Amino acid sequence: MKKIIYFFLINFIFLFDYVNSEEIKVSKKLYSIKNSNINFLHDVAIFNLDGSINVVVEIPAGSIEKWKLNSEGDAIELELKNNILRKIDYLGYPTNYGFIPKTLLPFEINGDGDAVDVLILGKQLIIGQIVRCNVLGMLEMNDQSLIDNKIICVEKESYFGKANSIADLKKLAPGIMEIIEIWFANYKGEKIEIIRTSKKKKTFKFIKDANKYYLENLDKKQ
């Protein structure tokens, strides 16, 4: 329990330690972040030649603001709820949070209609940053009966990059999976069902299936 409390305190200390990026443009009026060179959802490849995946950051570790990719995929926006900028009423995010480009969990399969969510372990990142990550596994979850799985990844160049599986991560950083599970089970103030953690083989199948749904959805729109 002491490790868990300490972890969250460290998150708050680094809450505003953001890194500048010339490619990222912020419009305070629209609470929107864009990259002038690419569409976050459609223009970024999923897989790299070394087996890592590309992840787009939506929410930096430690933040309480709820940023999310818009429906066009070209901007990450601070969500509105009842015309109020959305913030979570809980401790800040324990990891960086983002999505895998060119993926979709459609409503037909009981998905939420969004790209696949990712938790990125490593240093605090910035909104709109594209990061190469190694996949360790997946936290299987349901949010109000919808599939809400989270891919567990590590930033390749970080301390956590030494891990190659969930089992490795538990040895490298004892208590970290418990922290993540406790946080996601409670941050909304309503019951989220944590089902299980899955290994890499099942996780990659989940990602590839989500890419298939994304491509099928593109075909329907054309």
Residue ranges and their predicted role:
Residues 22-222:
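Hydrophobic N-terminal alpha-helices or hydrophobic patches in metabolic proteins across all domains
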